[in-house]
From Swiss-Prot:
Protein name as it appears in the record: Histone H2A.2.1
Lineage of the organism: Eukaryota, Viridiplantae, Streptophyta, Embryophyta, Tracheophyta
GO cellular component term, pick one: nucleosome
Record keywords, A-Z: Acetylation, Chromosome, DNA-binding, Nucleosome core, Nucleus, Phosphoprotein
UniProt-recorded Gene Ontology molecular function terms: DNA binding; protein heterodimerization activity; structural constituent of chromatin
Modification sites for N-acetylmethionine: M1
Family according to the record: Belongs to the histone H2A family.
Mod. after translation: Phosphorylated within its C-terminal part, probably at the SPKK motifs.
Sequence ranges of Basic residues compositional bias: 140-151
Position of sequence motif SPKK motif 1: 140-143
A family per Pfam: Histone_H2A_C
Gene Ontology biological process terms from the UniProt entry: heterochromatin formation
Membrane-crossing segments per the record: none
Major site of localization recorded for this protein: nucleus
């Protein structure tokens, strides 16, 4: 009984039981760490002073971009019948999206490969066009015999 009284006295003395801390990320409804981004902004010396809303805004923008890229990469993985996102899927997602492609145009993704592209001039003609041309004219002109070289 004396132990419970001591706890009550201690609770009154120090302001009650400690409340669970609420982070800035939780207050903003974000997954990205607002406090850490704020610390990086201050430590990086991008400006003399950093406003209280700047890290929240930057965290929200980064979270949105990450969600957008991951959604498109997940779709690319699904199109390739894979369950794991690999750098190739990230590259396909970014390069096939016009806005993300422009934003990340100078970025090289390791193990991403290249976008498949064949110049239309190099593609074979359609079968219908071949049949029409074959009936109208020979495929190649007849070769003429060369005159023998003089020694």
């Amino acid at each position: 009984m004396d132990g419970s009284k001591a706890k009550k006295v201690a609770a009154k003395k120090f302001g009650g039981p400690r409340k669970k801390s609420v982070t800035k990320s939780i207050k903003a409804g974000l997954q990205f760490p607002v406090g850490r981004i704020g610390r990086y902004l201050k430590k990086g010396r991008y400006a003399q002073r950093v406003g209280s809303g700047a890290p929240v805004y930057l965290a929200a923008v980064l979270e949105y971009l990450a969600a957008e890229v991951l959604e498109l990469a997940g779709n690319a993985a699904k199109d390739n019948k894979k369950t794991r996102i690999v750098p190739r899927h990230l590259l396909l997602a970014i390069r096939n999206d016009q806005e993300l492609g422009r934003l990340l145009s100078g970025v090289t993704i390791a193990h991403g490969g290249v976008i498949p592209n064949i110049n239309p001039v190099l593609l074979p003609k359609k079968a219908a066009e071949k049949a029409e041309k074959a009936g109208a004219a020979p495929k190649s002109p007849k070769k003429t015999t060369k005159s023998p070289k003089k020694a």
